[in-house]
Amino acid sequence: MIGSEMSTDIQQQLDTLREQLAYHGHRYYVEDNPEIPDAEYDRMMQQLLALEAEHPELMSVDSPSQRVGGTPLDSFTQVKHELPMLSLDNAFNDEELNAFEKRLLDRLITAGHVSYCCEPKLDGLAVSLMYENGVLVQAASRGDGATGENITTNVRTIRSIPLKLQGEGWPVRLEVRGEVFMPKKGFDELNARALKKGDKAFANPRNAAAGSLRQLDSKIAATRPLSFYAYSVGVVEGMDLAESQYERLVQLKGWGIPMCPEIRQLKTINDVIAYYQDIGERRQSLAYEIDGVVIKVDDVETQEQLGFVARAPRWAIAYKFPAQEEMTLLNNVEFQVGRTGAITPVAKLEPIFVGGVTVSNATLHNADEVARLGVMIGDTVIIRRAGDVIPQIVSVVESRRPDNAQAITFPITCPVCESNVERVEGEAVARCTGGLFCQAQRKEALKHFVSRKALDVDGCGEKVIEQLVDREMVTTPAGLFKLSAGIVTVLDRMGPKSAQKLVDSLANSKETTLPRFIYSLGIREVGEATAANLANHFETLEAITAASKEQLLVVPDVGEVVANNLLNFFREAHNMDVVEDLIAVGIHWPAIDKPEEGVELPLDGKVVVLTGSLSQLTRSDAKAALQALGAKVTGSVSSKTDLLVAGEAAGSKLTKAQELDIEIWDEQALVDFMNR
């Protein structure tokens, strides 16, 4: 009995210390308004650490002590995002921003106006934080938007991120999305410490933040001055959030999640432009690096009406600041050959620090761009990081041109294989005619073929492809599938286990889908979305290869240029040989599953809303099942809603559906309907 009372007393001490440390940590790291001296905070933390060391059975994942880091990891595991983490389209001037609003209004078919939620575009790393019953259970990087890395142990060390939400009334599951960044002051102090120890300094705060989040040892991450601001939500289960983007962030702030103090609700696009100008003027005085502002439609229901394109929401845009510029010398020009044979002039520059990185190369794109710039070897040029990412030559300082400046001469034969170079009428790009005979094209074509979005061959990276081509072990995509583990072991850093893993991965990749196969062929201008549209429209590879231009133009996302590229590709005998060889080595895919003509789907055209927590299905599985039955799944209840599927703890959406006399199913009713 005494032991039980003692255990209860210790648990109460731990709970009190954890609660006080969480409160004072929030006051210090988020509100910048400490209530107690640092020494008192440190004393409480030491007391907590001592108690937890004595009673490890009472350890809690949301304890403030978890911020100091744990046992180093061997590697990061992959995390599949339940909802994709999309990127944003960009605007670089007021005209492009006004065009963005016009697209919104045209799509909404309204002459009215749209209100916006605006925020600085932080130069950091996008992350997803998953809270279950108020406790942080997982943090993941954005990755490619569909799959990221599990960085939970590192994110737990970020003091401004609550390990447990404050207050009450939060959703059962809540995914918070935001930006991890390193404030300027912390970055400067980190680099000063590194230089003092003789270590290499980070180039910019973004690189420092990225390097910190990818530390396998979270104790190192815990020493880095990282911070976080939320900018949106992903998965929400168990209750409905506010119908305003801005108000949702205010809700998050009430639960202890940091919100950028510069976020504003604005009524008109002119207000947005004024906000952009104001933030731009104050950019250097802000505590963190930014490269523009993000503009989002504020009303969540309107966001859902606008929807998404392949990689970005239609309802948001990043308005970038003019890129930083510097002057440097153009020492030489080299010509690179790309996957489709495009020959690109690359300027070799005197290294210059611009926009946070050292730049020594910049693309000159093509002969038209060289002529437009009037640039010569030996010139002093102004270099800019377009969108603060891609180095670009924007002009020549002709007053500094030396007497020995040389004109840039384009090759008439390929610099790699010496095949003829041709420039098709109406195109700016010159191309090598060598095809797979050209090593450069062969390498790039094979790299594309095995890439994640194509055949997704694990263990077949760039260096492996380069060695296979350089050693003339593979000349066509089909040749990859004829490799044996014994042959592959001759490659650098390729032991028997790695070789067998590569061969097994190649064998597994033979089972693919028609959209992936079309994309893997590397047809110019045919991306993932176009490949999927072609597959869904024609259903078979034979129908695609035999299609006329008129038939191709009927396909969504296929215009004149793409149609011509498809026709030209499949008319080339050597391209059809590549396709037939791939089929011959066993590449295959399931038939496209489409409903029979004239067959009406059970929920065809019905507008369905999902709400509450589901126990038998995941939210994504339920949505996919409803869509397969013909339904249009939306996120908010309105007079247009035909059906509400309500799980446990359904909130205001259920109430609204009842008020509007909308048909309501529970989860079991949906499962039964699916199994009919």
Curated annotation (Swiss-Prot):
It catalyses: NAD(+) + (deoxyribonucleotide)n-3'-hydroxyl + 5'-phospho-(deoxyribonucleotide)m = (deoxyribonucleotide)n+m + AMP + beta-nicotinamide D-nucleotide. GO terms for molecular function: DNA binding; DNA ligase (NAD+) activity; metal ion binding. NAD(+) binds at D38, A39, E40, Y41, D42, S87, L88, E119, R142, E179, K296, K320. Its cofactor is Mg(2+); Mn(2+). Its EC number is 6.5.1.2. Residues 598-676 form the BRCT domain. One of its GO terms (cellular component) is cytosol. The active site is at K121. DNA ligase that catalyzes the formation of phosphodiester linkages between 5'-phosphoryl and 3'-hydroxyl groups in double-stranded DNA using NAD as a coenzyme and as the energy source for the reaction. It is essential for DNA replication and repair of damaged DNA. HAMAP family: DNA_ligase_A (MF_01588). NCBIfam families: dnlj (TIGR00575), PRK07956.1 (NF005932). PANTHER family: CHROMOSOME TRANSMISSION FIDELITY FACTOR 18, DNA LIGASE. This is DNA ligase. It comes from Photobacterium profundum (strain SS9).
